[in-house]
Amino acid sequence: MTDSKTVSVYTDGACPSNPSPTGGIGIYNPSTGIGIGYKVQDEDMTNNRAEMLAVIMALMSEDAESIEIFTDSEYVSKNLTENIQRWRSDGYKGIKNSDLWEILHDLTYGAINVRFVYVTFVRRGSHVGNKVADALASGAANTTDNYVWDYKKDIDSWINKDPTKRHKKASKPKPKAKPAPNNEAKTSFMPF
């Protein structure tokens, strides 16, 4: 965490029978000790979609001026770093999971400052927050509970509540990435 106005959150997604109609997401905020896990269903659910939904939920849930998202998904962090701007300018044509990439773009280039930290495979075991988020996602994916997060409805409701959150361009230029504390993770993306 960089300052008192920044919230750090760990996210993870799981899809035990990849692909399958059911997966789970986990979000953990170490400063509050609060973690949540949600079962998610989608005809196209995969590990990657679950990872993306976990980040979306974290960005929609946290009320902060600045947020750090720790993820062990190279798919999410790499594509947010290297491809999302080009995909958006091309209208997401031919891009798998384009519905979620569009939402992630809108959230990360919106009104709050977002910094993504990629938790590398070697370091995953040393990140307690990553372990908690992983356990929450796996538990939610495997639960027999009937509650399922209706993410499409919630995302639409969130966007409709404040339409300025859609397609708002960053007001400041993107600064250079900063190294994560103690070299425990690799910074992959930091739009402002």
Regions found by a protein language model. Name each.
Residues 1-49, 60-62, 135, 139-140, ...:
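RNase H-like nuclease fold core
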Residues 45-50, 94-98:
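Conserved phosphate-coordination/catalytic loops
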Residues 142-192:
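Acidic two-metal-ion nuclease catalytic site recognized across multiple nuclease folds
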Residues 11-20, 37, 57-136, 163:
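RNase H catalytic domain
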Residues 111-115, 140-147:
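Short secondary-structure junctions and interdomain/linker hinges
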Residues 50-51, 129:
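Hydrophobic (often cysteine-bearing) scaffold residues that line and stabilize catalytic clefts
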